[in-house]
Each structure stands twice: as structure tokens, then as C-alpha cells.
Amino acid sequence: SPQGLREAADRLRRSGVFKSVSLGVDDCITAQDQLGITATLVENKRRHFSFGAEVASTEGVGITGEWMHRNLFGGGENLKIDGAISNIGVAQGGVDYLLGAMLERPATFDADTTLTFGIAGGIIDDVDYDMNFILISTGLRRVFSSTLSGSASVSCLYAQTTDPGGETTFQALALPLTLIWDTRDSTTNATKNGYV
């Protein structure tokens, strides 16, 4: 059905593997009374790198970088590794370092569910405290319909801080849940409906 074709094309686009997706119905019926579908796909570059730098009078120089590998194992998996160095050259405090990685696996359990794994760590050198931390997370993202999507995840944080009061160790467990209802007529230039 046309609706089924649209849903299949949307799933392929959401994977991030393809920059262009077109699904069309064939003109002729086969001997088994079946109508074929032709898929025209243009694959994104498998590897992507980005780099950024910013300068602020109060926060010094910041440098960010990101590397992404699309379709890592051939099933639409995306691996993203990003890092940041900030507060370079500030008068107070020190340099902060952040490094993280995220693996996304689409079509887990069913065609509309994406499984995610993430790990991040950092060193924060603030005026009032120093902190070393590591954060590990895993979760599921689900598209329920063309207007409704949601996610559920679990994350574990371990951090050590040092301040004038001494050294403190933190351990935290978080269970973030999100639900998005998007009825906008356009994601880039909406003129009606809403986003909650």
C-alpha cells in the first residue's frame, strides 16, 4: 500500500545510512500476481568527521571534534565518537576534557525501535571544584507513528570531586523517559500545529 511504502522509506531515512531514498511500484505484475517494488538508494559516506573551535572572552578557547562511522556492521549501525577541550587560557580554573562514544543499532526487536549504548568520561577543572566522571548508558528509542515517538534509557554515573571541603564520591542511577508528539507541518519552517 502507499502508506506501507512511505513507512518503509521513512525507516530507511531514519537509519542515517542513506542520504536519498525512493521506493516505487513496478509497472508490470509478475506471473504470481505480485507487484514488485523498486528501491533507489543513495548511501551516505560511511565515515564523517567534523571539527569546531570557539573563542569567548570569559570561557577561553574551546575545541570540539566528532567522528562517525555509519553502517558499521552492515545492519545500519552508527558509531559516533566525540570529544571536547574547553576553557583553554581562562584566568580562573583549568582546562576541561570530555570524551564520549555512542553506538546505535536500528531495527532492534522490530523495525521502529533503535537500541543505543553510550559511554562518556571527563575531567572538569572548575574554580571551586575538580571532578572526574564516567557515565554509561543504554536505551531504546521507538517511533510509534508519524507524529509520536519516545525513548527510555538507564544510565549510571560515577564521579569523584575535590573541593575545599575534601573529596567526595558520587554514584547515581537515572532512568530518563521521553515522549514527543510532533504534528508540525514542517520541521524546519513550521507554520501550523505543534510540538510537545
Positions of the model-derived regions?
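Gram-negative/organellar outer-membrane beta-barrel architecture
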Residues: P2-V196
